[in-house]
Structure formats: C-alpha cells, structure tokens
Amino acid sequence: MNNEIITGLLLPFLGTTAGSACVFFMKHELSRNVQRMLAGFAAGVMTAASVWSLIIPAMELAEGMGRLSFIPAVAGFWFGVLFLLLLDTVIPHLHMNAEKAEGVPSKLARTTMMVLAVTLHNIPEGMAVGIVYAGLLHGTAEMSSGGAFALALGIAIQNFPEGAIISMPLRAEGKKKSAAFGGGVLSGAVEPAGALLTILFSSLILPAMPYLLSFAAGAMIYVVVEELIPEISEGEHSNIGVIMFSVGFTVMMALDTALG
C-alpha cells in the first residue's frame, strides 16, 4: 500500500478531526441556520459523489465487463439502501435536535447515541473510499488516481462541518471540550477502518466492484434523504439549506470532473 492510498484513506478522517476541533475555538453551540448550512453542504457533496464517483463508474465498469450496465447499478443501489435501513432499525442512535432515539430501545446516554448517529452516516463514506482505492490498486481502468483523490477530498471537505456538528452539541450537552472533541473524532474513525478493511479484501471483491460502488452510493443517498434533508428543512422555513446543498453538489461535481 503506497503513500497515495494511505493519504486517500486518512483524508476523510482528518476532515472530521479538524471539524471536531472547532469545539476548542467556538464558545457557543452552532445556530440553527448554521446547522442547516452545514447539513445542506454535506448533502450536496454526498449526492454528487454518489453519482459522479460511484454510480457512473459502476455502470462503466459493468459495461466493460460485458454486462448490462444498469443491472449492477440498480441492484447494488438497493442493497445499499436496505443495508442502511437495517442498521438504522437495529442500532440505537439519536439525530441532532431530536428528542426521541431511533433503533432498538436502549439505555445508552444521549451523547453516545448522538455519536452513533454520525457513525452510521460515516460507514458508507468509508466504504466508498475503500472501494475506489481498491479498484485503483488492482489497475481497474475506470478508476483513476485523480478520481479517487477527488472522492476522498470531497468527503473530507464535507466531514469538516460534520465534525463540528457532532462536537458542538456534545459540548452543549455538558461534556468537557476534550470529551466532545473525542466524540467527534470517534465518529469519524469508522471511515479509515472501513476503507482499510475493504482494501484488504479487495482481491475477493474485485469481480463485484460494480455492485459495491453502487452499494456505497445507495447507502450514501439513504443518509442524505433520511438524515440530512430533514435537518435542512426542520423548523422555520429557510432556503439556506437548499443553497448550500447546491454549493456542495457543484463543489464535488467540479472536483470529480477536474481531477478524475
């Protein structure tokens, strides 16, 4: 595993860590409008990454293998949606600004369930980076070094506000700054771990690469629709979330087309 791949795997985690560090510099919890802006931006990045970095390469890869391109894309996408739906149903977690936890009944602390909610969010992102770099490692023609880096960088950019979104509310819940920072960092640790595991098993998953790429896309779109869009539209009406969604979408689209 070369330095390029190691950098790509660590970039998203560094984005979360940097965002979590905001708890040391900001005195007050993020305002509702700021949370909307950050959630909108993250949703835009994830949606664009799902299309340009995952679904389109999945279809191109399937076509190169002599398969009907839409079948792996559709099947993998649905597997990703159903997988996140299963995790969402089983794992106890608490979304930002929510009073009632989701998942199986649990006596876990509110702060723990808040971290679990963001951790669920980060699972498909880690898988997406790992799958793309696994394809690059094995010389898959549809995977370029620039495209893989664009995906990792795009996720790192949207992880920065996510780190702040988790650490600041933890601080507001009464946690010490160091503990709030640690919670944010912990929520992002699943990304490099998941990406590394994907690469370690890359020789086994290579034939299923089109399905896995679209699987990651389906999981990411599930997170956007189930978690981020409600955050954008919650409370008093505002267009700022939609504007920031568009900004995030165009940033990720530009990154992928420029570097890919």
Question: Where are each of the predicted segments found?
Answer:
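Intrinsically disordered, metal-sensing/regulatory segments
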Residues: M1-G260
